[in-house]
Amino acid sequence: LGYIEELRTLIGHKRIILPGSSVIIQNKDGFILMQQRKYPHGRWSLPGGLMELGESTVETAIREIFEETGLTVGNLKLLGVYSGEGYLCSAANGDEWYVVNTAYITSDYKGTLCVNDDESIAFEWIDPNKLPNDTAKTHRIIIGDYLCTVKEKI
């Protein structure tokens, strides 16, 4: 069992706080990589995920990006840390948690993009000014901050 699964065996479905990381990966055309997730069905979000024991937020970001996309990322730049009442998440099994999401930006990536896990339906390079309607609300906030703070390509 992983850390979160082991924790859940002890506390059940109670709300908890979990740290995680996400990454805005920007290509040479200024588009960003978005992930269409299986749950909530079809929702678009930034690639990323939850921290494992002993990881830094950067290590979490690098691991999650590779696991989900097959891409290796480097030169991560901190965008911000996002948390609060609006960051309540839930899983299909009823588990709930508040995420503390550390968001990074990079244009340093290599590898072949592919759906590598059981969480994803697809990946697309998307114009950050034209997000899909079903983009996660919390990730819209992160992408909005990205658009406000990044005036030129990384």
Per-range role (PLM):
Residues 1-22, 94:
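Acidic, metal-coordinating catalytic segment for phosphate/diphosphate chemistry
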Residues 17, 42, 96-100:
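Residue-level preference for beta-strand/loop junctions
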Residues 25-26, 34, 106, 125:
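Conserved hydrophobic "DFG−1" position in protein kinase catalytic cores
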Residues 27-68:
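Conserved Nudix-box catalytic region and its N-terminal flanking loop in Nudix hydrolases
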Residues 72-82:
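A short coil-to-beta-strand element that immediately follows conserved catalytic motifs
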Residues 82-112:
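Active-site-adjacent beta-strand/loop module that shapes the phosphate/pyrophosphate-binding cleft
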Residues 103-107, 114-145:
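NUDIX/MutT-family hydrolases
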